[in-house]
Amino acid sequence: MNCEMVTSPESVNLGDSNRAVSPFCLPDCSENAVAQTRSKTLDNAALDLPYVGNRKKSEQDFFKMLSSRDRDAHSTLRKRSNSLSSFLSTKSTSASENKFHGGLNWLSLKLNLLLRLQGRMNSARTNTSMNPYSCDSNENLSTLSSVNQNFNSRQLLATIVPESIQNGCSLLRITKKKVRQRKVSLDPISGYLMLDKNTGKAYKKLCVDDIKEIRQGRDARNYREQYKISSENEKRWFTIIYCADNKLKAMHMISPTLDAHNQWIMALEGLKTYRLNEFIIGLNLVCHQGEKMIDYSENLNPWEKLEKEQSAQLDLGDVHRMCQMLHLNASMEFLEETFQKADADHSGKLSFEEFQHFVSLLKTRSEIVDIFKEYTSGSDKMSLEQFRHFLSTSQKARLDSDSIRTLYVSFCSNDDSKMGLIEFTSFLLSPHNSPVVPVIQDMSRPLNEYLISSSHNTYLLGKQFGGESSIEGYIRSLQRGCKCIEIDCWDGPNGPVVCHGHTFTSMIKFNDVIDAIRKYAFVVSPYPLFISLEIHCCPDQQRQMVSYMKQAFGDTLVMKPVTANESVLPSPEDLLNKILLKVKCSATPLHQFSTDILKVGITDSSTDTTESSELENSELTGLRKGKRRMKNIIVQELQQLAPYARSLKFRNFSLPESKTYSHIFSFSERTIKKHGKAMVPRLSKHNLRYLCRVYPGPLRVGSTNFNPQVYWRLGVQMVALNWQTYDTGLQINDALFIADPPTGYLLKPPCQRIIGTTVGEEGLPRKIKLTIDVISGQQLRRARELSNSETLSPYVEIQVHSMEESPFRWCSKVVHENGFRPFWGETMVYESIISDDFYSMIRFLVHHRGSNGNDSIFANFTCPIDRLQQGYRHIRLLDMQGENLLFSSLFLKIKKEDI
């Protein structure tokens, strides 16, 4: 059934006064009818909207599109997109991603896309194949859809996105001020969700590739309640979480019927999964068992018998348009040169066989061919002994003979049990050749001996002044492996709320935050989660917090010591899947007055636990002038929920309270800078035994980050950063905790956890030489801001962040108009004296040189120098939101030596 556009009423601004009268009001175009519309429920209005279509029939059609072996997996289609989004939100290079070799046989399989655009799809058929795509090296996600060869892409897309949704349906869009009907359509070809297209109005569009998650039902309840929408609409409400301008945003919709709602969810999730599948299909994949190469082009014939042989030929323009569709950022000059090599009969058009040759030419990487020839003495096969020689001399691998043999056999061809060029390339791209040394650490040490991935102002999505508070900040942080989050609690009209006090930020319910934490606390890592509570609530609302946390967290909340008579903190292993509260505690009477002056302006989170005695003296002056306020009273019921992170106001490192194993000090960066070098040795000594947290100062209104290396070198366990800002500081933080899967914990070096040692005692400062050959790039993704006529012109910048105040920088030349396979062949040499290579970082940035001379960074990768492996390595790139750029990599040769 087609979904016709319904004439929507004029939008009416729904202020707080309107919302207070009715949980939900559909606005009327008549000013005189406003009072009547306040009593009109959304359900009644929704009944007037047309039915989107027959979802059951669409599902049956979709089943027909699947091969028999995949029909069992169809039931997971609705969950698959969210699972993939969750996986892709983590920036760690997982083993599964490396199982996809960046070859180009998929071009052959997707010729039908171009033919469809040319109107020649009558006889062309496509046959796609299953791809393993797992969250880690051991477990696969639900298998991606396999499409039967009797159906083409047009049929599949029409099934995923019904015609009614393609043409546009009336949905209600909910914003802060308005509720209005919008014509919403989904274009399966471009992948854009569009609002009010072809209605004569300015329209908004959103690419499904930018969708991070789709929330519905109870998972979106907090948004529905925030906008005061009746619970009767819960089943038809869905929230699209997407990324735009490097920020998380939310789009809220209500479908007219439950069937329409379900069809929209399936269309959005199905198209997102399909597009990811399209990007993967046809690549030279590595099988999950044995990780052997499969060349699908030998097994598939998507062309079959065409009615007209001439329609099976492509000219240079066709190939260029196809490469643009498939994000192959190659210049016209490069494509023309390759095209001419493949055009054997010089006809100016490619047959299918010639196109296969064209693809093989694109796939050929001369730099790997040269390496292969060097270690095989020109042979077309690499023997076991030659492979062993390559690993030991080039890659500096320390593997025993049996391990090398097992690795070699797993990559050998089934035909002759020998490693050819394709298998060798597969190895270079596999997790077995990762550029980063895997983290294998003891998790049985006390908590104070670990660095803990920590977030500051977790609830904010943007700036500290006037920004938006959202549970998305908590969800995204937890999905990325954060293990210490912050909640600023304030009195709300109907219970505690979370916001950044006195800064005009929005508010969210405390209970909604707790619900989100409960759901996502351990989805990535089972190790304990710290919740830093900053309390600004009255005693009654504090008790409400206690009650709800006990109810929501249950046994996962640690409310008493794990064992009796403890003298040291428990280990992460002792606290698997446990939640620890960090709460300000005091031995002084609860009714005392504070010496805090009333501060005007931006609230510095945690200030009540960080000020030194020097600051206290200045505040006493304020008291004499009559500027005083009642200290926040932390009720005993709440203090008792923090057996291992009792936050104390810092007075002196020598006091008895500073030597209790369960206390924690919190300092702003401003406080540490103010005390300077005098504080450094005492703080470092304190952090050998006890917990400490450092967070950004209040003047960072843009939510920027400091360099966390400064505080890691002092042994600070919880260096809290603004995770909403993916700047250099956060990239360095992510690099330190990089792991697959992420744990959120990293054991400190011995000098920072063993009493009696000092920094550098494991080894004197040494001079190192780091040589990196920047060889080439692979399938660099086109930056969104580029115009359709502009081709990527990349260059590489390398930075070394060590103890120097300014990082070392080196830049390559610009490769103009080639983002598909740029070749640099340049060498960076870095020499320096290093005593703390545990915290020293190397950072790779890929820039685009614009036609107007403006440069922009579109990809990055950061890694600790001491964990950077030597030899030929592919580094997997991230975009500037910290998301994986699938199949985009830099090919390097790395050498480290002491001099």
UniProtKB/Swiss-Prot annotation:
Ca(2+) binds at residues 343, 345, 347, 349, 354. InterPro entries: C2_dom (IPR000008), C2_domain_sf (IPR035892), EF-hand-dom_pair (IPR011992), EF_Hand_1_Ca_BS (IPR018247), EF_hand_dom (IPR002048), PH-like_dom_sf (IPR011993), PI-PLC_fam (IPR001192), PLC-like_Pdiesterase_TIM-brl (IPR017946). Residues 638-753 form the PI-PLC Y-box domain. Substrate binds at residues 582, 584, 666, 693. It catalyses: a 1,2-diacyl-sn-glycero-3-phospho-(1D-myo-inositol-4,5-bisphosphate) + H2O = 1D-myo-inositol 1,4,5-trisphosphate + a 1,2-diacyl-sn-glycerol + H(+). The production of the second messenger molecules diacylglycerol (DAG) and inositol 1,4,5-trisphosphate (IP3) is mediated by activated phosphatidylinositol-specific phospholipase C enzymes. This is 1-phosphatidylinositol 4,5-bisphosphate phosphodiesterase 1. The gene is plc1.
